[in-house]
Amino acid sequence: MSESIKKELDKYIALISTLSGVLQIYLFGSYAYGEPGEYSDIDLLVVVEDSLDPINATVKINQKLVGNRTTPLDIVVNRKKDFSIAAKENTIQKYISDSGVLLYEAS
């Protein structure tokens, strides 16, 4: 992964992690697995508290990132409970839980 992508990820983590209720941020997809191509985007899964609405959380995350994106970015938001349940099945969440890169975890 290039230094510019690492810096961009650090910036995204710093911005997203300031939002209330953010528990974890995972990197998945081509950048996580070392296979980015010319047209690759950055794929992030954000796990939020069960009390939050994932759609509203997605809106707030995108508002935080306005003007701070230089690489295409795809964000998926899951409630903690939903992520935990889905990670036990043959789903993208299981793939992320098993092979994704945990970039942030709330203390």
Enumerate the language-model features and the residues they cover.
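Glycine-rich beta-strand-to-loop/alpha-helix junction loops that act as flexible
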Residues: 28-30
